[in-house]
Regions:
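Active-site neighborhood for divalent-cation/phosphate handling
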Residues: 2-101, 206, 233-243
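Adenine-nucleotide phosphate-binding core of ATP-dependent small-molecule kinases
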Residues: 90, 151, 158-206, 213
Length: 246
């Protein structure tokens, strides 16, 4: 998650090799990283920015605590997978957004990506294909599962399965799902207001829904009605080609 990461853009000599840059960054690490270097996982990349001094370049430094990376790698190992790359969430969103950008209506410049995960909801605002704002809230699909669990006397696992299979009593839509959807709208509206109050923007052009809870029935429609912006569910397969063998 972006909140667990430190990013810093620093100037360095253009003629340095990557090995030399790494040595220099590690020597100067205390300036940029507020925890011991042996507890850090860090990486860097030379940015394509053109500086006034052609002998200097901007270098993006990214660091997080090593335990943050190891915890996620261990989860993958339990699933029989091996992690090859650890990326920052906001950078991943920028890369993924390139897939959707061409599918949006003409004139759409400022897009809010509302990612509703299991425990966290993140609003990332895109402007010219770059993330210009991110806000995370501790709220997600887990709350809906817990409401199902409490309402119908199920275990958490049973509630999760019932939510996915939509095998719930007739009063579910009114008594449980409806209030949850309203809570999602409130969270989204609050995040947007924080964005507007901290920037020169007072509106966005479009909202893309993403995450494991993006396809909850009625969510996109309710967000569009309440917030006043067009809302669509992000579909990464919309422009993807398939092999004739599939």
């Amino acid at each position: 998650p972006t909140s667990m990461v430190i990013t810093k853009t620093i100037e360095m000599d253009a003629d340095m090799t990557d090995d030399e840059r790494e040595v220099q960054i590690r020597m100067d690490a205390e300036q940029y990283i507020p925890f011991p270097l042996d507890e850090a996982s860090l990486d860097f990349e030379v940015l394509p920015d053109r500086l006034a001094n052609p002998n200097r370049v901007n270098v993006l430094l990214v660091a997080t605590r090593l335990e943050n990376v190891e915890a996620r790698a261990e989860v993958l190992e339990l699933a029989g997978l091996t992690a090859k790359i650890a990326d920052v969430e906001s950078f991943s969103i920028e890369n993924a957004y390139q897939v959707f950008a061409d599918t949006l209506p003409m004139g759409v410049n400022t897009v809010g990506i509302l990612d509703i995960g299991h425990t966290m909801t993140t609003l990332s605002v895109m402007q010219k294909n770059k993330v210009i704002y991110t806000r995370e809230q501790v709220f997600g699909g887990k709350q809906l599962t817990q409401e199902i669990q409490n309402r119908y006397g199920l275990s958490f696992e049973e509630a999760g399965r019932a939510k996915k299979s939509r095998s719930l009593p007739d009063d579910y839509d009114v008594e449980v799902l409806g209030p949850y959807l309203e809570a999602v709208v409130q969270q989204a509206a609050r995040s947007l207001q924080f964005f507007f109050s901290s920037s020169q923007f007072n509106e966005i052009d479009h909202i893309l829904l993403a995450g494991g809870n993006a396809n909850i029935p009625g969510l996109a429609k309710l967000l569009q009605q309440k917030l006043g912006y067009r809302v669509t569910v992000a579909n990464p397969f919309l422009q993807m080609g398939f092999s004739p063998q599939i």
